[in-house]
Amino acid sequence: MNYKPNIFYWSPFLVPIATPKAVVNSATALQNYGKKYECSIINFFGEFNPYQNELKDKNIKLINHFSEKLLKILPKHGKLQSRFSFMVIFILSFFPLKKLISNQKPDFLIIHLITSLPLILLIFYKFETKFILRISGLPKLGIFRKFLWKKALSKIYKVTCPTKSTANYIESLGIVDKEKIITLYDPIVQISKSNFQKKKSINLPFEKSEYFFTAGRLTKQKNFLFLCKAVKRIILDVPNFKIVIAGEGEDKDKISSFIQKNELEKHIFLIGYVPNIFPYIFSSKGFILTSLWEDPGFVLIEAASCRVPVFSSNCPEGPKEIIKDNFNGLLFESNDENDLIKNFSKFNKIINNNETKKKLILNNLILARQFSLFNHYLKLNEILSNGCN
């Protein structure tokens, strides 16, 4: 029987975000297309329990440690509260993770979230395992953190980045050899799965194609309060404008208060966290993204795979790189309300013209295919195969 390299994924998280989906999809891609790897996801606090049936069906192992009861009591919302929780996870996981890597000796450990823990382990201990750091968003490095990263990355096998601009940024920091930096697109598009999911029914108080849609954590990054302020002006020209916002987060009360205070309840609909956003995207007139930064912006790719036109801020790193203005979507200047209003008017005209709308959608669909599970597998398999030689 041929030996199968063991791949461990490290990605502890507190609330549903895009990264865990990327981890599951990455492991799925290796299991489905390669059939020569044994993939396991480290599930220290039961954070991946919602995926356990899916992972079992795909023969992806979960490595459990602490009870999920601990995860339930940790604070999840607010900058200080979430930092406290991450510190608790760091302290409780330090020696168990070291023991796991030392005893199990996986061929590769792919690090997604709470990256500081495995990187510090890499500085102070010697492992047979090759560490792969997955960058998600631009890291903020002070003098001390930059020193630690440089020390750890001297022993890292590879650093993978979700966009070319992020790869260029990491290279510019001078903290890791250029040869170790690789652009690896996230595994987002799974056409068969999204085609099935988008057909599920949704419950909204209006007809299909009467609304625009957006989704994400209700945080400063997603800039939804800015969007609500823009809606207040948009409805002066488009009185029947409606937008559905899916997500939870620390800014929810602030956003809800603004909607009520400005009597926008018939135009802005907060529907909370939705496990399956595909039918909401598919039934919408278009997808709007107002983020201050994304890397790359999962929902943009998911909207493209649903054949829905995209209107996005030109924020770094993903949207600015992924969306080509007037080619596969329309852009507006990030956090500029006047520019959003001006360009939304153009966007509305484009999507109300079948010919221009089809061109926009087709171009975006073609671009989205580079974020398929198969393309992710091809690149990651190349990285892993070189490391096995």
Which residue ranges define each predicted feature?
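Short His-centered aromatic/hydrophobic patch
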Residues: 89-93, 111-117, 135
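A short, well-ordered alpha-helix in the C-terminal region of glycosyltransferases
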Residues: 355-370
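Short hydrophobic beta-strand element within catalytic cores of glycosyltransferases
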Residues: 309-313
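Conserved acidic donor-binding segment of nucleotide-sugar-dependent glycosyltransferases
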Residues: 325-326, 330-338, 346-352
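A short, active-site helix/loop in glycosyltransferases that binds the activated sugar's phosphate group
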Residues: 156-181, 188
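N-terminal strand-loop element at the rim of the active site
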Residues: 9-17, 29-87, 180
